Curated annotation (Swiss-Prot):
Native species: Haliotis laevigata (Smooth Australian abalone)
Boundaries of every C-type lectin domain copy: 9-128
PTM note: Glycosylated.
Ranges occupied by Sequence repeats: 136-145, 146-155
KW Repeat (keyword) present: yes
Keywords: Disulfide bond, Glycoprotein, Lectin, Repeat
Function: May promote nucleation and/or growth of calcium carbonate crystals. Binds to D-galactose and D-mannose/D-glucose.
Glycan attachment positions: 84
PANTHER family: MANNOSE, PHOSPHOLIPASE, LECTIN RECEPTOR RELATED (PTHR22803)
Protein name: Perlucin
Length: 155
């Protein structure tokens, strides 16, 4: 399953922030939650994230885990992973003013598409972590319960 506050889609769990942070702060916050800024690998994942963001009903924009901070125009996911799937808004990325280097999921005319944006600007963000297969998480919980039970019996 997924930790409290995370939402499941296939093998991943996603957390949609209610707070706004710069790109770097958002990445740090996701690490604190033992996750990373969301990486969108395919259309299915994109549809889930866009659908969930839309259902939240807030016209928020969200940081995703990619930038072209290293080489202008070379967009990579966190961990230097190449982008095999993209869903840029028409005319994006445009590096407006020469200072847009971080990937934002932007609500435009009621639809969520990708946009490059200034990394230091505050935005909402989406964290992603791998889902723990249910059997393992249940087993871990039972182990914790058993060791807790054993500790209590020793007292």
């Amino acid at each position: 399953g997924c930790p409290l506050g995370f939402h499941q889609n296939r093998r991943s769990c996603y957390w949609f922030s209610t707070i706004k942070s710069s790109f770097a702060e958002a990445a740090g916050y996701c690490r604190y939650l033992e996750s990373h800024l969301a990486i969108i690998s395919n259309k299915d994942e994109d549809s889930f994230i866009r659908g969930y963001a839309t259902r939240l009903g807030e016209a928020f924009n969200y940081w995703l885990g990619a930038s072209d901070l290293n080489i202008e125009g070379r967009w990579l996911w966190e961990g230097q992973r190449r982008m095999n799937y993209t869903n840029w808004s028409p005319g994006q990325p445009d590096n407006a003013g020469g200072i847009e280097h971080c990937l934002e999921l932007r609500r435009d005319l009621g639809n969520y598409l990708w946009n490059d944006y200034q990394c230091q600007k505050p935005s909402h963000f989406i964290c992603e972590k791998e889902r723990i297969p249910y059997t393992n998480s249940l087993h871990a919980n039972l182990q914790q319960r058993d060791s807790l039970h054993a500790n209590l019996q020793q007292r």
